[in-house]
Every structure is written in structure tokens, then in C-alpha cells.
Amino acid sequence: MEVGISLDRALALVGTLSFARSTETTPLSDLTGRILASPLSSKVDDPAFDNSAMDGWAVRAEDCTSEGTILKIVGTSRAGSNQLPEVSAGQASRIMTGAPLPLGADAIVMVEESAEEGNQVKILGPARPGYIRKKGENLQKGQQILPAGTLIGPAETSLIATMGHHEAETVSRPVVAVISTGDELVQPGIELSPGQIYESNSYGLASLVEKMGASAKRFDVVHDNIEDLRTTLDEAASSSDAILTSGGVSMGEWDLVRRLMEDEGEPLFWKVLIRPGGPPLCGSWKGTPLFGLPGNPVSSHVVFLSLVAPWLARCMGADSKLGPRLADRVRVRLSEDIKGAPKKLCMRRIRIEAGEDGLVATTHTHQGSGNIHSMVAHNGLTLIPPDTDGKAGDIIDALWCR
């Protein structure tokens, strides 16, 4: 087991862990939040035919070179109709948004730029070819549009439907067990006794797991009993693809996750040189990847964002740009001095906002690792190198959390 390693080394070591990935066919209505297992190509041209981008008149542009031209109305082109009028010289057809372009027409006049007079229409504005949406200008039949590894959101779902697919092959959601440990933990809604606190980590971590496109399986709190912990880890290993624990990984007498992993598990490393989040443990329990996260809420979130999320995305075959990711690396200008951390990567919480000359980072709340409110008040983390202080005006690397 390696002890006290850099974040880059930790990422390299977790890269040796994995789980079996499977796929399944998912109906269109259930695709949001899923990851594509194979590329998707369009089954159709989009648009499928030349059509109007607005309500108005389908005309021949050569008939409308001057304002006040009067044309004979010869019919109407409606969306969904397969009966098209034909427009000849001196004629116009009513046309609705999305309706096919009548034969002979090559331009559209907006209805607001016309005056209808019986069976004639006076053209008061220009005829514009640009108001016509051309066949296949958005998508071409057979064109590959979405690569494997794409996280499907609302826009992707609509696009998949537009391409003619009623289902898609997706990565089966891996099951991630989430286990909080500690005698002091009580479920929200129960009145606290002296020395107790509400259990929050499993809810936050489960939400992060779900946001990555995986399925979280929350376990009941495991109190500080090594037999109970062993039983719970065994159950998690047999029913999950990966295990997240929070608490019990530091150097105290009751840090049982670390003790049990060292005695009976297969630990890869313990302690990463970051602040906050320094004492994470990683390895395998009964062949199942296990991440032992710190008990402090902020530390557990930071370790998940910087270590677990990239690993989970890779194991699910996520595309590096279109797949799930919870943070993007950006450059920001510090608006204030930030003290770094001796020998550790400083991941201070920051609020990233657009400034006049780029992204600006500020801090807004107390930075204690137990203050989960600071993760709400901020939307980023600094990446200040070890033994380095950040000065106001410095341009630094940061994670912009999504």
C-alpha cells in the first residue's frame, strides 16, 4: 500500500481498478441520464423536405423584385399535408411554418409584410430564400451524430427522437454502494441527543453517483463495530459494482474502515496530498473496488469530484467531452490572496464568475472541511500547487464544478 501520494499518482492507481461493463436497450422515454453504449446515426434527413421557417407566402423571387407587387393566391401549404399547390408566374401560395415548399416557389414573404385582398395578395416586403429550411441542412440520413459515451440530456433526447430512434443501446447503470460510518450519526428528522449529528454524506454522495449516470445503493449507517462493518462490506461487495464509504479512514482508534481494509482487504493507497480531503483510502474488498472517503462532508465531496468521478466515467466508457463530468478545468484570476498548503495541492472552494477580462475567483464563506454550506456557496475549487500561495491577480488552474 502506498501512503501519502500525489493526486496524479492516485488517479493512476485507481486506473488499475475496474468493473464489468454491460449494455442494455433503453426506450426513448427513459434515455435521459443514460450513457450511449454505441454511436447513433440519423435514420432520416432533417428537415425531410424543403419547408418554410415562418407563416407567410410561398412565391417566386423573380415576381417580387419591387414593393407592391400583386399576386394571385392559388392555394395553401399546411404542415403535415402531402397535397402541394403549384406556384407559377404571378402567383403565391399561403404557407404555414414547417409546411412543405410548393412546387415552383423559391422564396417566402412574411405574413406581416403582405396585405391580402380577396383572392390576391399585395407583397409589401422582400421575398427571402433564407426563410426556407432546406432538406438535410441539419442532419443527413446515415450521418453519425452522437458518439458512444455521450451522456444523454434533454437536448440529446430530443435529437435522438428527431433522428428517428425510439430506443438506443446504453451502458447499464453500475451500482455503487454508499455507506456512512460512525456512532455519532443520526438520520435527519430524528431529534438529536448530545454528541450526535445528522448523517448527510450518504445523501450527498448518492446524488453525485446518480449525476454521473450510475445507480446509488444507500446502506444504513454502520456504527463503530468491526463485525457490523465487515458484514456490510461483504453485502455491498456481493451486490454492487463499487463501494463508497465515508468516515473511518484516518488514524484514530475507531477508524475501522482503514483497519479492516489493511487487515482483510486489498488496499492500493492511503492518504492523498490534497487539502481538504487528505486521508482517502482506495483498494478492493472481495474483488470490488472500494473508495474510503473522509467523514468530513466537504472532504468527501472534494475526493469524489477529483478522484472517484473521473474513475467512474472511465469505467462507464464515457466520452471525454460529451460524457458525464462534474468539473471542468479552467483558468481563473484570483480576486484575493489565498494561502496555499504545505506539501499539498490546495483545493480551496471558490466562486467562479465572469469578469471583464475572463473568469474571476472569489471566496464567500468559512472554509472548514465540515462546512458543507461552503460547497453550495461556491462553484469551484482551486488547484494551487503545494507550498505555493495564491496572490490577488494571479491566474491559476481551477475546477469549475457543474
Feature map (PLM): residue ranges:
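Flexible glycine/proline-rich
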Residues: 24-29, 37, 80, 262-402
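Electropositive phosphate-/nucleotide-binding environments in soluble metabolic enzymes
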Residues: 4-8, 22-25, 29, 34, ...
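Solvent-exposed alpha-helices and their adjacent loops that cap or buttress functional pockets
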Residues: 50-52, 63-66, 84-88, 101-103, ...
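Helix-rich terminal scaffold detector
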Residues: 3-7, 166-293, 297-303
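Short, glycine/charged-enriched hinge/interface segments at domain edges or termini
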Residues: 13, 18, 57-223, 365, ...
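Short, low-complexity N-terminal leaders and the immediately following helix N-cap/first helix
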Residues: 1-68, 318-347
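Short, hydrophobic/aliphatic alpha-helical segments
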Residues: 32-45, 82-94, 282-283, 287
